[in-house]
């Protein structure tokens, strides 16, 4: 299987900074590992130009959010048609910062995921429990609810359309985040994959995000239930991103042939 490894810039990088990153990444394309699918998610002001720079490369480019409607009186929003007009490949949905600060709900994430699939965009759906939910022993129930809500609206129309899930425990995100242990993350991934496959009837890759760094990326990707990495600040310099990509390739070399958790756990 292909391992997905990418980064979102969040609200960082000017257009020129994003383009410098993209150009360096394009230059490194000949050295890419075909077992690893790379992706970058810049700010809205940079997506079109970053995609233009990376068009001839294997790197996929996405947006950090979108509305579920194609058009209308939604001031300040971006529609899936607009993202397709920028020739984007994927769209990040439901990040915990969107849920906490901008009123994103399980319902709206589901609407957006369905809209993304209708328009040929790969949804990268973020899920994760808070520290309180983890401490109360509710992590698995919260993750099940989030996965079911995100996929309920796409189960009949998804077909074989690509869908990605990103497990990002809220307590592991940000400058003060505490990375989940590889064992803890792997156990959560196993449950997430099983729920997703029970809905869609097929495997869905589950990426880990939450303080991924050069010191833990190899152990994380070495877990059989972790299908990729969604990196934050450790990949905001292109050198940092390329370093983690090299470490991921080395970890894959040391591991046996990979299957997704859902492929192993369910018939």
Curated annotation (Swiss-Prot):
The keyword Flavoprotein does not apply. One of its GO terms (biological process) is glycolytic process. Signal peptide: none annotated. Homodimer. Belongs to the triosephosphate isomerase family. Catalyzes the isomerization of D-erythrulose-4P to L-erythrulose-1P. PANTHER family: TRIOSEPHOSPHATE ISOMERASE. This is L-erythrulose-1-phosphate isomerase. It comes from Rhizobium etli (strain ATCC 51251 / DSM 11541 / JCM 21823 / NBRC 15573 / CFN 42). The gene is eryH.
């Amino acid at each position: 299987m292909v391992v997905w490894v990418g980064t979102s810039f969040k609200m960082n990088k000017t257009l020129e900074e994003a383009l410098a990153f993209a150009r360096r990444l394009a230059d490194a394309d000949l050295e890419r590992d075909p077992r690893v699918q790379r992706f970058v998610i810049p700010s809205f002001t940079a997506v079109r130009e970053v995609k233009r720079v990376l068009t001839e490369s294997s790197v996929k480019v996405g947006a950090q959010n979108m509305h579920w409607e194609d058009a209308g009186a939604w001031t300040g929003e971006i529609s899936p048609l607009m993202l397709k007009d920028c020739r984007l490949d994927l769209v990040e949905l439901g990040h915990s910062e969107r849920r906490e600060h901008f009123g994103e709900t399980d319902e709206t994430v589901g609407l957006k995921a369905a809209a993304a699939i209708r328009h040929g965009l790969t949804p990268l759906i973020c899920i994760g429990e808070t520290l309180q939910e983890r401490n109360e022993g509710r992590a698995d129930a919260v993750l099940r609810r989030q996965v079911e809500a995100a996929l309920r609206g796409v189960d009949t129309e998804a077909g074989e359309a690509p869908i990605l899930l990103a497990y990002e425990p809220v307590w592991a995100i940000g400058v003060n985040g505490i990375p989940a242990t590889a064992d803890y993350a792997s156990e959560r991934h196993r449950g997430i994959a099983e729920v997703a496959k029970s809905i869609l009837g097929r495997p869905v890759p589950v990426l880990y995000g939450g303080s991924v760094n050069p010191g833990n990326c190899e152990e994380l990707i070495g877990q059989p239930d972790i299908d990729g990495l969604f990196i934050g600040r450790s990949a905001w310099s292109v050198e940092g991103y390329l370093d983690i990509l090299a470490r991921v390739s080395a970890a894959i070399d040391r591991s046996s042939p990979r299957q997704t958790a859902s492929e192993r756990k369910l018939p």
